[in-house]
């Protein structure tokens, strides 16, 4: 009888612990507005930091010049935030791809943009910013390329709002 009670207690504890494990995050829901992530990035900045000035860019020729190959990938949504001065290392690009097989392709395109900025020998200070403060993040069908100036915060997971 004691063994049966002990066994039942072990099973009960195991079931309780399994219930406490929680559900792993699968990433953002498809169709989550990209502005949600952009605003979360802006809200994460230190209070004493100067306000970041970025403009939403929609010119397809300009976008294609910075992100060659991106125009051949089917996107559900896209948002490009660029600084007023093109050589300033401060960009936030957020996309949601329609086909999950394209996530890595987009990440590679974004990494190529980072590499291009980091290799800019005409503006060594700008290149240093791209080398030190730029990254690509992925979650589900969402991909982000972000570079912010020194002293600003890139969230560990841009897509965790």
Model region roles, listed by residue range:
Residues 1-8:
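Positively charged n-region of N-terminal signal peptides that target proteins for export
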Residues 11-12:
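Repetitive helical segments and hydrophobic/amphipathic motifs
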Residues 15-19:
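C-terminal motif of bacterial Sec signal peptides marking the signal peptidase cleavage site
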Residues 20-91, 97-161:
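Soluble, non-membrane globular domain cores that form compact, hydrophobic packing
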């Amino acid at each position: 009888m004691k063994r049966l009670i002990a066994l039942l207690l072990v099973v009960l504890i195991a079931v309780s612990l399994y219930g406490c494990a929680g559900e792993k995050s699968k990433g953002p829901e498809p169709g989550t507005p990209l502005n949600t992530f952009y605003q979360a990035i802006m809200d994460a900045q230190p209070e004493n930091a100067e306000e970041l000035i970025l403009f939403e860019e929609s010119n397809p020729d300009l976008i294609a010049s910075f992100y060659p190959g991106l125009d051949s990938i089917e996107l559900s949504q896209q948002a490009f935030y660029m600084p007023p001065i093109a050589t300033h290392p401060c960009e936030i690009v957020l996309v949601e791809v329609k086909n999950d097989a394209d996530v890595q392709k987009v990440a590679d395109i974004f990494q190529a943009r980072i590499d291009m900025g980091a290799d800019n020998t005409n503006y060594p200070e700008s290149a240093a910013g791209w080398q030190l403060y730029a990254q690509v993040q992925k979650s589900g069908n969402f991909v982000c390329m972000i570079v912010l100036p020194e002293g600003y915060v890139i969230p560990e997971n841009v897509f965790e709002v």
